Design a protein with these regions (language model features):
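Bacterial N-terminal signal peptides that target proteins for export
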Residues: 1-8
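Bacterial N-terminal signal peptides
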Residues: 9-17
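C-terminal and inter-domain tail/linker signature
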Residues: 21-183
Length: 183
């Protein structure tokens, strides 16, 4: 009986330790997303393209491959509502994210679905604020060394095999708080 109690105590301590070391609710939600529901073949193909986009192209900065998922004249609607047009501008904007957090990655899409010409995915974007963040006019925010893990979502409208409009969503206030420069 004592041996069973010892084993149960060890398991409980291990579980508490793992939970205490969990980085953020975004990475370790209390209630995980349900299992992926199979979509139509055309939607599944677009979702695979989305996975490749985030997990490989974005996370490894393979900008020469962005055309595999983005049209040349793509419109991007950013979390703050501003829009940009064109794949070259989008690449420049994406590169800017890696200036202050060179280790940014997206490695999971817990929710993936689509209908017709639209797809939607959620993800977790992680990184560490390790180099100065340019804020314009030659000014910078100095790095805090803090890690971030943001819940994000992307809605894509597809024309053929590429997106012609992409809507990006994440909480900028939460991001600034996580990197130690916001309230």
């Amino acid at each position: 009986m004592n041996k069973v109690r010892s084993i149960l105590a060890a398991v409980a301590i291990a579980a508490i330790t793992i939970a205490a070391n969990a980085d953020t609710p975004a990475e370790n939600p209390l209630t995980p997303a349900p299992k992926h529901e199979r979509q139509s073949p055309s939607i599944e193909q677009k979702l695979r393209t989305f996975d490749t986009l985030d997990f490989d192209v974005f996370s490894n900065q393979k900008w020469e491959r962005l055309h595999e998922s983005h049209a040349k004249d793509i419109v991007i609607t950013w979390p703050d509502g501003h829009e940009t047009k064109g794949i070259d501008k989008h690449i420049d904007d994406l590169k800017a994210l890696f200036v202050f957090a060179p280790d940014i990655q997206i490695k999971t899409h817990p929710i993936r679905f689509g209908s017709g010409t639209f797809t939607g995915v959620t993800g977790v974007m992680t990184g560490t604020f390790t180099t100065p963040m340019p804020v314009g006019e030659g000014k910078f925010i100095q790095p805090t060394g803090k890690r971030f893990a943001l819940s994000m979502a992307t809605i894509g409208h597809w024309s053929g095999k590429t997106m012609d409009h992409e809507w990006l969503f994440w909480d900028n206030q939460d991001f600034m708080k996580q990197i130690g420069v916001g309230q």
